[in-house]
A protein has these predicted regions:
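N-terminal capping/small domains of soluble enzymes
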Residues: 1-160, 167-172
């Protein structure tokens, strides 16, 4: 509501020290989806990432809530790319370009389109520095998903070779 209505227009009021509804409001899933933001499979543990992914599928399929999850820049497991659940995921491409060869190879086998594609232009949390995934966290499955050797992985602060809007558009075609 805060993005659409001013504070005075919100359908809530405080009465006797409690927040009360002053008029009917639609359930949150009628308004917009809930999104689990960018968390790569390399940054989280595999089990944690897969647990969130399973929760996203469950909340959509069993509860009817429009929940989406962004893959983070580390790519996605092929079994998810080729599943019906891909429609709940936003595939991210970021400055490290990790996992994109695998995603491109999986495209002919995808049963559905992803919920979206997120193009991360720069590292917002670490502007000018980029990010590092320590070698210790680059397990075999991370190497397979990202198509990289076991080494510390650097994600540059921006897309190398993209210095203008025109260059960005050319890369997307």
């Amino acid at each position: 509501f805060g993005r659409v209505l001013s504070a005075k227009e919100l359908p809530f009021a405080i009465k006797d020290g409690k927040l009360v509804e002053t008029k009917h409001t639609p359930p949150v899933h009628w308004i917009y989806p809930l999104i689990f933001s960018d968390m790569s499979i390399g940054a989280l543990s595999t089990r944690a990432w897969e647990a969130v992914a399973l929760a996203v599928g469950y909340l959509n399929e069993k509860c009817g809530l429009p929940v989406r999850m962004s893959s983070g820049e580390g790519g996605m497991p092929v079994k998810l790319l080729e599943s019906d659940y891909l429609k709940y995921f936003i595939i991210q491409i970021a400055s490290g370009h990790f996992g994109w060869n695998r995603i491109i190879k999986a495209m002919p086998h995808m049963k559905t389109d992803p919920a979206g594609i997120l193009i991360k232009i720069g590292q917002g949390a670490k502007p000018g520095d980029g990010g590092l995934l320590p070698e210790a966290k680059v397990a075999e499955h991370v190497q397979a998903i990202r198509g990289v050797p076991k080494a510390t992985l650097a994600s540059p602060p921006n897309h190398q070779g993209l210095y203008s809007i025109e260059e960005s558009v050319q890369k997307m075609h």
